[in-house]
Each structure stands twice: as structure tokens, then as C-alpha cells.
């Protein structure tokens, strides 16, 4: 092809990009490649990843040590659950009746000496316990949602990978590379939905602008004009035809109602919205359910429970970094925004609402739910006032449910003070491999027409977690 023809094509492609948003084009790119391979996805599975940004205390939630000294066990009591022998925090009254729906892992661990949010988040979300590249560098390891978008893009008119409310950042808590897609590229990065000032528990919540058509008549005219130009210039060129097909799919995705409706909680009954809880975490989990129901493959939900009513300055968009007084966050066992008395009942309501709703709608078989922080908390309660706990990567707890995960079991153990794993450790690598396996993502298979030449994880799925 001569230089003139190349420049002419580039000009037309640039013009076409102006008609449709880059986010919308990225939404359909993976689906376009899937169609060309001619391979059908056996089951359209999705994942809701509830990220408890900051790292909750495992000792005060799901791995309680009631016989340990008070300075270790903390002030809360465990309660019995539907599963004999499984005991959880007394404020998890609704989850206690749903323990047959999920598996509780009490042996999560980070190898090495991680102690900060950035590295722990990066290892957890990338599924690799390797040193991260400098923040924002595109050659770094992609996160789970990016790989899932690459291998199993949505086949419907909606995004494949979404993140509901960024954790506080930068530089606090926020995973360093959530917005770039790592070495896969920005087309596989998540679409960000909402913020601390714009979330679905608010009456005026505004969804992302990827479905904003602007002047629809003008858009239609531009589409017609571009089609006329392409028919004369690009129709004889294979790449040009591919572009035309991709543009039409993007236009279709923008103009059909399914994508927009997924973000509209007005379609839900008042009873359902109340069931999840009228707070950021509850309404975001309801939004996540609507999104996977509409075809989104991977939704990360920031586990922010909101700002306590009496707090004049609560957390911007995180809840679980409960240091107590040594960082000015208030009593970790109190009722403030960084207090378990405020956060745990809201987590109980929102998560039990999600699990029950998925079960009733017949969505559990094809929806994986993961609930975890990036690490746990120190066995010893800090002695300064008000009390709290520091970061602890050696041992923490997670919940998995759906997509073949067995219910009613506790996997792994920690020692008598919850400081170290004593059996069946699960690193970020094993957790990632388990998630990929549950979603039918091929592990370490660079020949799968994906263009990926590096393994997506070095871990192996924990098959004992599956029912």
C-alpha cells in the first residue's frame, strides 16, 4: 500500500474514532476477536469481586479466637451458624444463616514481607507475588479482570470489566495499576463507575458516560456520512472492512438499551433495594448483580460502607484500614466510619442480600463471588487509645461462593492467635488460579489464540474448594 493510501486510511480511522467513544470501542474489541475465532463460550460466567480495601481484621470477623487472651481476641463474641463448627462475628446475623452458600478460607497469606497496601493489593489483584513495576507502568502484570476480559469478553452490549468506586487514591490503598490493563493494554482496563460523591445510594447517581449519545440526530448523520466514505475507500481493504464491522458493533452497543438499563436501579423494587441496604456497599452490590445479569464478566466492588452519620470527616471511599488512634481513625471497635460497629452490620446486610438474591434468581452456578481484603490485621490489639490493629499479611480470611465453589465449609487453619497459617495456605497465585478455573479461563496456555506469551498465574487452582 502506498503512503497516500495509508494516510487516507489513517484519516478515516481517526474520523471514525470521533464518532464513537474509545471506551465503547474497547468494549467490543474482545468480542470481535472472539467472533472471528469462531469459538462459542460454553457458559457465560461472571465474577463479583468484593474488595474490602484497607484490610479487615480476620480475628474480629471470620477467624475469631474466643479462647485467646483479651488483647488478642478483641471485644466481640462469635455466634453459631447454619454450618456446625463454623462460627463468625456476632454482628453477622444474616450471613450466619447463609453459610451453606459459601466457603470460608482462613488460610490466606502473602509470602515475603509485604506490609503496605500498594504491594499487597498488587499481589492480590494480579495473582502474582512478584515485585510490582513502578506505578502506572504499562508493562506490569495485568489484574484479574483484564485477563478475564481478554479470554472471556462479554458477548452482549455491555462492558466486560467494571470497577465500582475506586478505593481512596492515590496514593492510599488504591491498587497501583487498576486503570491501565498492564501489558495487555488499556482496552482491557476496567470502566470506573461512581465515586464517594456519586454512588448508587444517592438519589442523583450518574452512571459513566459511555452510553451518552449526545445529539442523536447528529450522531446518525455522522454515521451515515462515514459509511458512505468507507464504502468507496475502505471496502476493498480487509483492514478497512474490519474497522467498519467493529464500528458498527460499537454503534449498536451504544444505541441499544441493555447497557444503560444495567446501571439504572430504578428498575429494582423498593423491597430489593432495602434488602441490600441503602448505603454505598449495599447499592453497589445490587448494581453489580444487575451488571453481571446484563453480561458484564468481572465487577470489582469497593467494600466501602459509607460515612457514619455523626462523622464530620469520614473516609473518602474506604472502610477497613482500622488502625485506631495511631492514625487518627477513631476506635476500630466503635461506631465511626472506621469502626466495626458501623461497618460489619452493613457488610452483613449487603453480602447476605447479594448471596440470597443470586440464589433466588438462579445465578449462583454462573456467578463467582469473592470477598477479601488485601491482608489481615495484627493478632494484638494496639494499646494506644482508641484501639485498633495494624497491617498483617501473614494470615487473613476470604469468602468464595458460586460458580462451582462448595458451600458450608471452612478451608485452612491459623494458629491459636490467628497469626500464622498452620494448614492449607493459599497465596494470591492460588486464589487467582482458582478464580480463573471457576470462570473456565485456561491457565498458562499461550497457544489459546490470545496473543499472551506469559503465564497468567504461576499458581494452581485449589480444587478442594469446589463442590
What are the roles of these predicted feature ranges?
Residues 1-467:
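Ligand-binding pockets and gating/stacking loops
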Amino acid at each position: 500500500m502506498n503512503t497516500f493510501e495509508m494516510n487516507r486510511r489513517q484519516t478515516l480511522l481517526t474520523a471514525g474514532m470521533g464518532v464513537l467513544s474509545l471506551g465503547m470501542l474497547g468494549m467490543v474489541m474482545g468480542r470481535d476477536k472472539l467472533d472471528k475465532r469462531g469459538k462459542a463460550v460454553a457458559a457465560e460466567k461472571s465474577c463479583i469481586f468484593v474488595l474490602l480495601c484497607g484490610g479487615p481484621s480476620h480475628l474480629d470477623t471470620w477467624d475469631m479466637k474466643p479462647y485467646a487472651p483479651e488483647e488478642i481476641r478483641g471485644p466481640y463474641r462469635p455466634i453459631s451458624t447454619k454450618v456446625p463448627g463454623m462460627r463468625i462475628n456476632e454482628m453477622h446475623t444474616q450471613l450466619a444463616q447463609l453459610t451453606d452458600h459459601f466457603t470460608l478460607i482462613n488460610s490466606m497469606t502473602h509470602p515475603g514481607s509485604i506490609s503496605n497496601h500498594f504491594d499487597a493489593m498488587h499481589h492480590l489483584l494480579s495473582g502474582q507475588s512478584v515485585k510490582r513495576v513502578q506505578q502506572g507502568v504499562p508493562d506490569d502484570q495485568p489484574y484479574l479482570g483484564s485477563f478475564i476480559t481478554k479470554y472471556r469478553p462479554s458477548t452482549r452490549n455491555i462492558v466486560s470489566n467494571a470497577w465500582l468506586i475506586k478505593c481512596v487514591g492515590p496514593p492510599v490503598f488504591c491498587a497501583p495499576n487498576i486503570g491501565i490493563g498492564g501489558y495487555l493494554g488499556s482496552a482491557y482496563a476496567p470502566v470506573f463507575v461512581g465515586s464517594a460523591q456519586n454512588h448508587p445510594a444517592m438519589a442523583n447517581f450518574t452512571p459513566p458516560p459511555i452510553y451518552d449519545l449526545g445529539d442523536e440526530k447528529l450522531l446518525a448523520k455522522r454515521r451515515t456520512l462515514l459509511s458512505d466514505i468507507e464504502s468507496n475507500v475502505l471496502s476493498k481493504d480487509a483492514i478497512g472492512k474490519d474497522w467498519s464491522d467493529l464500528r458498527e458493533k460499537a454503534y449498536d452497543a451504544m444505541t441499544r438499551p441493555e447497557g444503560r438499563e444495567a446501571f439504572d436501579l430504578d428498575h429494582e423494587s423498593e423491597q430489593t433495594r432495602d434488602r441490600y441496604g441503602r448505603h454505598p456497599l449495599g447499592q453497589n452490590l445490587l448494581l453489580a448483580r444487575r451488571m453481571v445479569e446484563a453480561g458484564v464478566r468481572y465487577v470489582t466492588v469497593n467494600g466501602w460502607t459509607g460515612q457514619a452519620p455523626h462523622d464530620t470527616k469520614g473516609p473518602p471511599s474506604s472502610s477497613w484500614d482500622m488502625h485506631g488512634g495511631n492514625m487518627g481513625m477513631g476506635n476500630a471497635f466503635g461506631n465511626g466510619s472506621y469502626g466495626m460497629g458501623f461497618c460489619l452490620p452493613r457488610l452483613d446486610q449487603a453480602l447476605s442480600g447479594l448471596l440470597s438474591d443470586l440464589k433466588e434468581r438462579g445465578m449462583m452456578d454462573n456467578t463467582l463471588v469473592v470477598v477479601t481484603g488485601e491482608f489481615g490485621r495484627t493478632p494484638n490489639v494496639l494499646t494506644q487509645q482508641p484501639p485498633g490493629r495494624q497491617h498483617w499479611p501473614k494470615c487473613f480470611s476470604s469468602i468464595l461462593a458460586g460458580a462451582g465453589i462448595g458451600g458450608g465449609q471452612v478451608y485452612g487453619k491459623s494458629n491459636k492467635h490467628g497469626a500464622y497459617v498452620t494448614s492449607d495456605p493459599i497465596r494470591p497465585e492460588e486464589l487467582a488460579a482458582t478464580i480463573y478455573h471457576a470462570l473456565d479461563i485456561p491457565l498458562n496456555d499461550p497457544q489459546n489464540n490470545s496473543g499472551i506469551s506469559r503465564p497468567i498465574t504461576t499458581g494452581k487452582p485449589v480444587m478442594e474448594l469446589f463442590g
